[in-house]
A protein has these predicted regions:
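Short Asp/Glu-rich motifs
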Residues: 14, 59, 152
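Long, internal low-complexity/basic segments
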Residues: 81-96, 102-104, 112-261, 268-278
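Polar, surface-exposed loop/tail segments
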Residues: 1-42, 111, 118-127
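A generic secondary-structure signal for well-formed alpha-helical elements
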Residues: 1-3, 15-19, 44, 49, ...
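Proline- and acidic/polar-enriched loop/turn elements at helix boundaries
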Residues: 7-8, 52, 145
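Alpha-helix N-cap/helix-initiation sites
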Residues: 4, 73-75, 212
Length: 286
């Protein structure tokens, strides 16, 4: 007999069940590359929700970068020799939402998320993904350091079932990245919930316009946040918007944190800042 706690269903043999209407996907950290995306697909359409749209698909990674192919991608990108579809993969950012007709566009090259003709389908797939995230109590929206603290003496399974944390509020703050105005992002950054503050900081990192004076002041103050995950993302936001010295000071300090999750988070942030973070090289090499 199949144990009650197993969620899988037979798809072959005498006891096979009805086919699923939807399948779900996720994209999270791999090695040093941090990311967060979720997806849902039915027989016709694939919907992808990118919660870190300021990060491209083709992020630098130590192991793949040892080969020649990635460097060819970098060269073609630098020389602006990519077509639109290639740039979607190789470029520095991603759309917040992606929608593809998998039957007519099996390579997923034509993003329909902004097409008026597909508004109903987009809404349907968006709702289905939200429903799935709620039902599964998806913990992927927690920064890793906070997750490890929460899991001490327990497990992710137990935390999710217990409803000890407000996953809805955290997920809402993540959904604000790339979407919300300053008022909403500031409210997130100044929340009593450190997990919401984390996403508030990322929201300012992803913001394309120049920081307002109010936002910059709030971020300056947040460099002293009690959470290292928040401090790192606040420093990232400030550095990306031109306030380098205090941001690097904070990031370099986190390289000495006793928790290696924090250290790798800070190191990756410094790496992606590129030449802006040149002053941090000695600390990275130490």
């Amino acid at each position: 007999p199949i144990p009650n706690y197993m969620q899988g269903e037979p798809f072959l043999g005498l006891k096979k069940t009805s086919p699923r209407k939807f399948i779900y996907g996720h994209r999270d950290r791999v090695d040093e590359v941090r990311d967060l995306a979720r997806s849902v697909r039915d027989q016709n359409f694939l919907y992808i929700r990118n919660y870190m749209p300021h990060l491209g698909y083709n992020q630098p990674t130590v192991w793949p970068d040892l080969g020649e192919i990635r460097h060819e991608f970098y060269r073609l990108t630098h020389e602006k020799m990519m077509n639109t579809s290639q740039w979607h993969f190789a470029g520095p950012t991603r759309p917040i939402e992606e929608l593809y007709d998998c039957r007519s566009d099996p390579k997923n090259l034509d993003n329909l998320a902004k097409s008026k003709d597909y508004k109903k389908i987009l809404s349907k797939m968006r709702k289905e993904l939200t429903k799935h995230l709620q039902e599964t109590r998806d913990l992927g929206f927690l920064p890793e350091f906070a997750a490890w603290k929460l899991f001490e003496g327990s497990s992710g399974w137990d935390i999710g079932k217990s409803k000890r944390i407000d996953l809805g509020a955290i997920r809402d703050a993540a959904s604000d990245v790339g979407n919300a105005n300053d008022k909403t992002l500031l409210a997130n950054l100044e929340s009593k919930n450190e997990l919401v503050r984390y996403w508030g900081a990322i929201g300012f990192t992803a913001q394309k316009k120049k920081l307002s004076k109010h936002a910059k002041l709030a971020l300056d103050n947040a460099l002293g946040d009690s959470s290292p995950s928040v401090r790192i993302e606040v420093a990232n936001a400030l550095a990306r918007h031109g306030t380098i010295k205090p941001a690097l000071f904070t990031l370099i300090k986190e390289l000495s944190h006793p928790n290696l999750i924090v250290v790798t988070h800070a190191a990756r942030t410094i790496e992606l800042l590129g030449k802006k973070a040149k002053a941090a090289v000695p600390a990275m090499e130490a």
